Amino acid sequence: MSSSTQIRPIAVVGPTASGKTAISLELAKLLDGEVVNIDSMQLYRGMDIGTAKVPPEERQGIPHHQLDIWPVTKPASVAEYRSGAIATVEEILSRGKMPIIVGGSMMYIQALVDEWDFPPTDPIVREKWQRELDVRGVAAMHQYLATIDPEAARIIEDNDPRRTVRALEVIELTGKPFAASQPPKNSTPRWNMRLLGLSAPAEWLNPRIEQRVRQMFDQGLVEEVRSLVADGLARTSTAGQAIGYAQVLDYFAGELTFEEAVDRTITGTRRYARRQRSWFRRDKRIIWIDANSPDPVRAATEALGIVSQQ
C-alpha cells in the first residue's frame, strides 16, 4: 500500500464468538494491516479472560491498537473512544498500512463508522435516574421507559441498567425520543470503509458461546475478577456490568452459586449475540459471509474483492 488515499479500512463485525478475531488476524497478515479494537470491554486494562482479548503472544507480531487504555474504574465513553480510534486509524493510514477494525460493540462501531453528533450528558440528571433505578430496579425502569419511548425500550434490553439510564437521561435533556439522537445508518462510511459481517445462526453459535464461557471460567475468570476488585472494579461501574464480570461479582456477594454464575453468563452472552445480529442486520452496507464456511478467510477476501498477492 503506497498511498493512504488508496486504502479503504476494513471493519470485521458480527456477534460474539463468531470468529471475528481469527479472520481479522488473517486479513491483517494478507493486507499488511494493523488491528484496531472496537470491543468496548477490551478497552479496560486487566479485563482479559472474560472479554476474549487476544494475548500478546497470539497476535502473530501484528500491531494491535485501542486495547488496555482505561482503568476499570472509568465510566465508558463512546465519544472518547471515537476520538482516540479516529486518530489511531488516521495514523495507520498515514504509514500506508491497512486498518483492520474488529469487534462487536454496536454503538462503538456506529460511532466510528458514521458522522454522529453525540447527545448531551448531565451528571446530575444521570445520577437522578441512576438513584431511581437503584430503588425501583432495572425491570421497572425499563417498563417506564417503554411508556414514554416504546422504540427505545424495543432496542434496549430489559436487563441493561446502563443503557436504560442513558436513554432516560437523553430524553429528559433533549425533550425528544432517544432514537432521534441515534446515528444515521446506511450513509457512506467514514474513510469509505468496507464492512464485513460474520453471519452466525443461533443453532451454530449457541454451542460455541457455551464452550467459550465454560473455557473462560476454566482459565481463571473468577481469579481475574477478584484481582480487578482490588483495582476498584464494582458492580456499579461500567466494567462491573460486563457480562461474566457482573455474574462473578454476584457470586462473590453470595447472590449466585458458582454454577448459576456460569449459566447466567452463558444466557446473557446468548442474549447479547441476538441483539448484535438484529442490530447489524439493519445495516445494508455490511457484506455478509458465513462464519461457519469451510474457509471463512477465503470467503472474506472474495466478498471484499481482495486478490491475494501471496
Curated annotation (Swiss-Prot):
Gene Ontology biological process terms from the UniProt entry: tRNA modification
EC class name: transferase
A GO molecular function held by the record: ATP binding
Cofactor: Mg(2+)
Superkingdom of the source species: Bacteria
Pfam families: IPPT
Region annotation (Interaction with substrate tRNA) ranges: 39-42
Residues at which ATP binds: 14-21
Residues bound to substrate: 16-21
EC number: 2.5.1.75
Known role: Catalyzes the transfer of a dimethylallyl group onto the adenine at position 37 in tRNAs that read codons beginning with uridine, leading to the formation of N6-(dimethylallyl)adenosine (i(6)A).
NCBIfam families: miaA
Subunit text: Monomer.
Name of this protein: tRNA dimethylallyltransferase
